[in-house]
Swiss-Prot record:
It comes from Arabidopsis thaliana. Involved in cytokinin biosynthesis. Catalyzes the transfer of an isopentenyl group from dimethylallyl diphosphate (DMAPP) to ATP and ADP. This is Adenylate isopentenyltransferase 7, mitochondrial. InterPro entries: Dimethylallyltransferase, P-loop_NTPase. It is an enzyme of class 2 (transferase). GO terms for molecular function: AMP dimethylallyltransferase activity; ATP binding; ATP/ADP dimethylallyltransferase activity.
């Protein structure tokens, strides 16, 4: 039976899947939702690296979801990606607010992130939301407006690392950050009367260095050295606590979003001894598996199987067949 495009608009087809009848608009079936990728994980797990890997392979851009990295400044302490690490991938909502600005609520973040997602999709770019503030991600997905779930298909990739292994890495990372100028960076913004519950001063490392910076000019060298050691130990301890808290929240969200969340175990990467081995393990155990996840996410949602299309047309018109493939990569 021949049919025209206009006839498609006039009939509401009844599709039968697994012996269940359901009315489905043909247009929504032939034109699937746009896509959004979320890269999640505890601090230090490699979220930013994976997000950039995926962005370079799928023409994406990254939307930051770390509540501390929203602010300008303290780039070493907050572990912002460097221009070299970005590899030319644009980042949004990264270092955009003044350090003295107040705290951005989850609702406010959801609005800003939604605007960024819409803009990127309109420009045929894949939005990749990445960061450690899982409360922001949960608020964005579950926003009362229904913006995200009504307009986008979501895929969540969880970069997981065994907590003892991650804690060891985080401890060494703090040492590297100290060598890279963390102390000098915090000293520049130090204010003995500052409120450590607002803005960028909430970052782990700022409150911990308060006593040292307040007293460094008043004590002898030995006392000063001991005070700095205590501050660094507290930075490491509180970062480990943060990683544990983030992991628990992700595990809760995994139970909630299980069908859409994919766990990628990066533990072996962190156990390698040299950079070459780490890079090879990352590519084989994290980057390529994640690339396959995203590729499958695209194809499963964007390509209609011939049987599905024939079923659609047969139910609506009593016969005929056709197919239409959508490949957004």
């Amino acid at each position: 039976m021949k049919f025209s495009i206009s006839s498609l608009k006039q009939v509401q087809p009844i599709l039968c899947f697994k012996n269940k009848l359901s009315k489905v608009n043909v247009n929504s079936f032939l034109h699937p939702k746009e896509k959004v990728i979320f890269v999640m994980g505890a601090t230090g797990s490699g979220k930013s690296r994976l997000a950039i890997d995926l962005a370079t392979r799928f023409q994406g851009e990254i939307i930051n979801s770390d509540k501390i990295q929203l602010y300008k400044g303290l780039d070493v302490l907050t572990n912002k990606v460097t221009p070299k690490e970005c590899r030319g991938v644009p980042h949004h909502l990264l270092g955009v607010f003044d350090s003295e600005a107040g705290n951005l609520t989850a609702t406010q973040y959801s609005r800003l992130a939604s605007q960024a997602i819409s803009k990127l999709s309109a420009n045929n770019k894949l939005p990749i939301v990445a960061g450690g503030s899982n409360s922001y991600i949960e608020a964005l997905v579950n926003h009362s407006s229904g913006f995200l779930l009504n307009n986008y298909d979501c895929c969540f990739i969880w970069v997981d690392v065994s907590l003892p292994v991650l804690n060891s890495f985080v401890s060494k990372r703090v040492d590297r950050m100290m060598e890279a100028g963390l102390l000098e960076e915090v000293r520049e913004v130090f204010n003995p009367k500052a409120n450590y519950s607002v803005g960028i001063r909430r970052a782990i490392g700022v409150p911990e260095l308060h006593e040292y910076l307040r007293n460094e000019s008043l004590v002898d060298r030995a006392t000063k050295s001991k005070m700095l050691d205590v501050a660094v130990k507290n930075i490491k301890k509180n970062t480990e606590i943060l990683a544990c808290r983030q992991l628990k929240k992700i595990q809760r969200l995994h139970k909630k979003w299980k069908m859409s969340m994919h766990r990628v175990d990066a533990t072996e990467v962190f156990l390698k001894r040299n950079v070459e081995e780490q890079d090879e393990a990352w590519e084989n155990l994290v980057a390529r598996p994640s690339e396959r996840i995203v590729d499958k996410f695209y194809n499963n949602n964007n390509q209609l199987k011939n049987d599905d299309v024939e079923h659609c047309l047969a139910a609506s018109y009593g016969g005929g067949s056709g197919s239409r493939a959508h490949n957004m990569i």
